[in-house]
Design a protein with these regions (language model features):
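Short, charged, amphipathic alpha-helical segments
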Residues: 141-149
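Recognition helix of helix-turn-helix/homeodomain-like DNA-binding domains
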Residues: 38-58, 79-83
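Short basic helix-loop element that most often maps to the first helix and adjoining turn
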Residues: 12, 16-37
Length: 157
């Protein structure tokens, strides 16, 4: 149970900043995550620091472990491919943490037969529904971030 909540700050869209944001959201220290990962030695925190600063990128297996420890969907922490329309939706969600009033409106985008356009549009509509719930105070900021950190795009419509 949290006694005091401090909103985490996202420095940029890098993988390291997103890992740090998720860790801070979970109110965990780098030492705690390092201990659970089984890192040892005097500088056990160094690996997490390097991940969060972007000096190193975790391999897939390590990223799976980190996402499991932080209880987030791996898609919220993975490296994004700007050529992948699915990844673009996750990027948009993170941009909202950098630019709080950032809004994407897909209501006027025409229906297109292209599969990924439909998937992206549906995902952004789901995200918009959650944003509206947060703005109407139907859900808390913490619940909203929890949803974003665990959101998984379903590629089959």
């Amino acid at each position: 149970m949290r006694l005091l909540y401090t909103k985490p700050r996202l420095n940029d869209l890098s993988q390291g900043s997103r890992i740090a944001f998720a860790r801070q959201f979970r109110t965990m220290s780098q030492d705690e995550v390092s201990d659970i990962l089984g890192l040892t030695g005097e500088c056990k925190r160094r690996t997490m620091t390097r991940y969060e600063k972007g000096d190193r990128n975790p391999k897939l297996k390590r990223l799976e472990e980190i996402s499991s420890i932080l209880k987030v969907n791996i898609n919220s922490l993975k490296e994004y491919d700007f050529n992948n329309p699915i990844d673009v939706v996750y990027i948009f969600m993170w941009m909202e943490e950098l630019i709080p009033n950032y809004v994407i409106d897909v209501s006027k985008v025409p229906r297109v037969d292209e599969y990924y356009i439909d998937v992206v549009k549906k995902s952004i509509e789901e995200w918009t529904d959650m944003r509206i719930k947060r703005l109407r105070k139907e859900i808390s900021y913490e619940d909203y971030i929890e949803w974003k950190l665990n959101y998984e795009i379903k590629e089959k419509l």
